[in-house]
UniProtKB/Swiss-Prot annotation:
It is found in: Membrane. This is Inactive cytochrome P450 76AD1. Belongs to the cytochrome P450 family. SUPFAM superfamilies: Cytochrome P450. InterPro entries: Cyt_P450, Cyt_P450_E_grp-I, Cyt_P450_sf. It comes from Beta vulgaris. Inactive cytochrome unable to convert L-DOPA to cyclo-DOPA in the betalain pathway and producing a yellow mutant phenotype. A frameshift replaces 108 amino acids of the active protein found in red beets (AC I3PFJ5) with 27 new residues followed by a stop codon. Gene3D superfamilies: Cytochrome P450. The keyword Transmembrane helix applies. It is a single-pass membrane protein. The chain crosses the membrane at residues 4-24. Keywords: Membrane, Transmembrane, Transmembrane helix.
């Protein structure tokens, strides 16, 4: 059998399979939330566009705050209003609490080793307990306030030095270096980068590659039957990126565990890594779980913060009168020479409004991780079918603007907040 004949047989089988599946699914179509009519085979893929959150906000104007789409062979429900989200999270949380696993995050069994993608289970509850008690407790966050201030001061001194030398400042790189060092100091008691080195740029590119690959459209997500062949090559690239990032963490962990190391566990540094290694010794965590937990935290905690900061500065440079107003507010509240403290932020409402407006226009992430219906669930008067994926649009404020004004307000306007 030649390759052309084999390809034709596979294509006929593939089309027939999805046609039969479509016929059987038409019985429940009337119960689904409203949405645009899907095309054969590809469904509504073409209607998503390059900016899905804006596409979904526009679709919500036509079809309402709960939309059903068919992306390839996958039924997708988009939640785009606070009212629907409240019903989903407060009343229907249990049958909608598990995750739809994108094909890309199965790289290196990442979905089995991290709290983000695990189903509700004893293992997931243990991860959640460890995170709440040891990583994000008020005591832990209060304890690191001093070096948070030190890292911000370090950023200030770097920018001041560049200004004195007449050098341009790469805002994204500077913010990323600060975010990276805040996390690495909290977790490892070391700084992983320096403002004048290329290390932070390399780390940033690695994190960006991971975030980009996870967020890319993937044929294997639209047609799960293709998952085993990884048609877009995303899973392979992501596995490589995971390995590079884990290698960084493993070098730090091995140094900590080395008997002759000055930072070995016999010497208590009282950082998060010490806690994780203690849990490892007590068989509460495996080394793989520690590595992939660190991957999640450093992915989520560095790129999102630095990209938001970069957009804040971009909008202020684009709107000099707003920058001047923010500077004036800081001078009035703090005086000319006092350095800003975390406790001062509550007295800077215009600065807070700038941050909120930046997050409205340039959200670092527009969707929560996708959920999955374990069974047919009634939501907002409609049926969410079993195995449908649920996407929650974090920027549902876009929808509210459309309903109020008939269009999205894309101008930077912190004074209205």
């Amino acid at each position: 059998m030649d390759h052309a004949t084999l390809a034709m047989i596979l294509a006929i089988w593939f089309i027939s399979f999805h046609f039969i599946k479509l016929l059987f699914s038409q019985q429940t179509t009337k119960l689904l939330p409203p949405g645009p009519k899907p095309l054969p085979i590809i469904g509504n893929i073409l209607e998503v566009g390059k900016k899905p959150h804006r596409s979904f906000a526009n679709l919500a104007k036509i079809h309402g705050p709960l939309i059903s789409l068919r992306l390839g062979s996958v039924t997708t429900i988009v939640v785009s209003s606070a009212d629907v989200a409240k019903e989903m999270f407060l009343k229907k949380d249990h049958p909608l609490s598990n995750r739809t696993i994108p094909n890309s995050v199965t790289a290196g069994d990442h979905h089995k080793l991290t709290m983000s993608w695990l189903p509700v289970s004893p293992k997931w509850r243990n991860f959640r307990k460890i995170t709440a008690v040891h990583l994000l407790s008020p005591q832990r966050l209060d304890a690191c306030q001093t070096f948070r201030h030190a890292k911000v001061q370090q950023l200030y001194e770097y920018v001041q030095e560049c200004a004195q030398k007449g050098q341009a400042v790469d805002i994204g790189k500077a913010a990323f270096t600060t975010s990276l060092n805040l996390l690495s100091k909290l977790f490892f008691s070391v700084e992983l980068a320096h403002h004048k080195s290329h290390t932070s740029q390399e780390f940033k590119e690695l994190i960006w590659n991971i975030m980009e690959d996870i967020g890319k459209p993937n044929y294997a997500d639209y047609f799960p039957i293709l998952g085993c062949v990884d048609p877009s090559g995303i899973r392979r690239r992501l596995a490589c990126s995971f390995d590079k990032l884990i290698a960084v963490f493993q070098s730090i962990i091995c140094e900590r565990l080395a008997p002759d190391s000055s930072t070995a566990t016999t010497t208590t540094t009282d950082d998060v890594l010490d806690v994780l290694l203690q849990l490892f010794k007590q068989n509460e965590l495996t080394m793989g779980e520690i590595n992939h937990l660190l991957v999640d935290i450093f992915d989520a905690g560095t790129d999102t913060t630095s990209s938001t900061f970069e957009w804040v500065m971009a909008e202020l440079i684009r709107n000099p009168e707003m920058m001047e107003k923010a500077q004036e507010e800081i001078k009035q509240v703090l005086g000319k020479d006092k350095q800003i403290q975390e406790s001062d932020i509550i007295n800077l409402p215009y600065l807070q409004a700038i941050i909120k407006e930046t997050l409205r226009l340039h959200p670092p992430t527009v969707f929560l991780l996708p959920r999955k219906a374990d069974t047919d669930v009634e939501l907002y008067g409609y049926i969410v079918p079993k195995d449908a994926q649920i996407k929650y649009l974090l920027t549902y404020g876009l929808l509210e603007e459309i309903l109020m004004h008939g269009k999205m307000l894309i101008f930077f306007r912190p004074k209205d907040l």
